[in-house]
Every structure is written in structure tokens, then in C-alpha cells.
């Protein structure tokens, strides 16, 4: 075996390791990662690795959520949770990209998409890191459906908030030298974050359930009606003993 062949064999990593390795790169050196996005370095490879990693992590956490009910619910949630985030991404990306262009941004669509995927990947990592906590409460409070639902809402909120922090930092770095319309783009980004959260919560409500209700047969989807926010309000009321959700 020649030295060059040995070198290739030594440095080549398995496909999965290459994709999941990007997680460590983001978490350890986020600003260096954002600088690479600004320079347009390996954007396609970055997007592919982050998409594979985040879909995998979302599927694993979705399976933990669905495990509260049945095997069918476990498999359903493992499929639907990645769909939720990917669908929300593609619904919301065009608005951020074109509004940013309108107010002077020079970012390409690939750069914008890569930064947003970074935020989604961070969210997926944090969700998966909370999976043992979710599993613990699943095993120790098996009959507390509303509590388990609120626990997951809290975990999603915290993980999503950290993802938004990464998104905000990433946009600032990638847009670093662009002064024209910088203040307006900042407010566009802030408003877009609220839109993204609203679309995501409504999307989740549309393709629910992710957690099967006790005593009910498996449902792939539920009938539309009500909304996410009122349901959370009633769930809080039931947990506090104020009333019972029917």
C-alpha cells in the first residue's frame, strides 16, 4: 500500500460520521462556521450534513414523544416531527430571503438557507439532549397526559429559543460588512422569527397528534378545530386543577 493510499484510508470517515461531525463544528466554533458561510465555503455539503443530522435527531425525539401511547404513534411521531420542521422551513425561507434582498442584503439563497439550517440543527441537538428527561417523566408519570404535553412544549420552546439565538448571531456574521439597510434588516429578522414560531406552532397543530391521548385509538391526524394556544391554555388549567380538558 502506498503512502498516498494509506493517507486517504486514514482520513476518510464513514458517511454518517462526516454528517454528524458538523454538529461538533457548529457548537465548538460557531463564529468560524458562520464565517465559512459568509465566504460561501462548501455550502452544499454543509446543508446536506445539517439536513441529515437534524432529520435524524428530530425523528429520534419524535419517537420518544410518541412512545407515551403506542407503537403506531411512536412511528408516526418519528416521521411527522422532521416533516414539521422541514415544512416550516420551506414555508418561511422565501419571506426572509426576499425581504432581506429588498433592504440591501447581498446574501445568496444558499447562504440564507445554510444559516437557517444551522439554527434548526442546533434545535434538533438540544431536543435530543433532552430526550432522557422526556423519557424519565414518561416512565414516572404515565397517566399525566397534559403534564407530559406541557413538558414537551417547554422543551421545544427552550430548544427553539436557543436555535433563534444561533440564527440571529449567524445572520449578523454573514451580513457583517453590509451597512445599507442594516437596521431595517435587523427588524425584518426579528419579525420573521415571530412569524416562523407562529407558522411552526400552527403547522404542529395541523399535523397533530405527536403524543397519543390516553384511552383513544391511534390517529394519524386529528380533525382541524381550535388552535394551539387555546389548547395549551386549557392544558395548563387542567395541570393546575382549575378545570378538565375534554
Question: For each predicted feature, which ranges?
Answer:
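Sparse recognition of residues in long alpha-helices and their boundaries
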Residues: 45-46, 132-133, 223
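Hydrophobic alpha-helical transmembrane segments and adjacent short intramembrane/lumenal linkers
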Residues: 80-83, 87, 96-212
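Helix-boundary and loop/linker segments of multi-pass membrane transporters
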Residues: 39-40, 70-71, 182-183
